[in-house]
């Protein structure tokens, strides 16, 4: 089994694992690929005549041809729910940190200390770009604290983004 795995060739469309993939047998020729490491860009399965498995590097599923792959007997695997939850929690924490910086950006040192203008969180607008697995969860969590606007390529037009950015804090 190990010998068979060592002989498998990997095709990828992501740089996520660059630096961690030394010694792995990569190919840029689809016909030679046994395994695909799939990033955020969608792929079609035409040309992958030897493919045995697709492994999604990120957490989204919208760019994976699941039904087509399974019909062809190709194994499809995604990161664990634990990994998805960790990414969500980290994204929500980063968002809270940015909100804190936005509210208290005027405060520098304590010497001389002055009482800054109080800013209400519910008056602020957060723009969440991308409402997939993580973005939708962050938007839902943050709407309890402030106004949330969302933008997603699958739901909005490109022209809407500029005005949404302008209205966001």
Which positions does each model-derived feature cover?
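Short amphipathic alpha-helical segments and helix-helix/interface helices
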Residues: 21, 45-48, 65-67, 139-140, ...
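Rossmann-like dinucleotide/phosphate-binding beta-alpha-beta segment
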Residues: 1, 116-169
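Phosphate-coordination loops involved in phosphoryl transfer and adenosine-cofactor binding
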Residues: 5-7, 51, 122-126
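Short helix/loop segment immediately N-terminal to the Walker
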Residues: 108-118
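A short, aliphatic-rich alpha-helical micro-motif
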Residues: 29-31, 48, 164-167
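Structural motif
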Residues: 34-35, 53, 125, 169
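Phosphate/diphosphate ligand-binding glycine-rich loop within oxidoreductases
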Residues: 35-107
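N-terminal glycine-/charge-rich "phosphate-binding" loop or analogous flexible N-terminal tail
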Residues: 1-38, 138, 143-151, 156-158
């Amino acid at each position: 089994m190990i010998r068979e795995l060592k002989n498998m060739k990997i095709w990828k469309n992501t740089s996520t694992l660059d630096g961690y993939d030394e010694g792995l047998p990569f190919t840029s020729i689809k016909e030679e690929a046994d395994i695909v490491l799939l990033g955020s860009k969608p792929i079609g399965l035409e040309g992958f005549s030897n493919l045995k498995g697709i492994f999604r590097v990120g957490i989204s599923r919208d760019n994976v041809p699941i039904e087509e792959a399974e019909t062809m007997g190709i194994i499809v695997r995604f990161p664990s729910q634990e990994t998805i939850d960790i990414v969500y929690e980290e994204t929500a924490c980063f968002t809270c940190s940015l909100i804190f910086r936005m509210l208290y950006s005027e405060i520098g040192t304590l010497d001389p200390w002055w009482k800054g203008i109080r800013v209400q969180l519910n008056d602020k607008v957060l723009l969440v770009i991308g409402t997939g697995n993580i973005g939708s969860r962050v938007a839902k969590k943050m709407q309890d604290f402030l106004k949330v606007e969302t933008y997603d390529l699958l739901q909005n037009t490109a022209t809407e983004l500029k005005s949404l950015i302008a209205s966001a804090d």
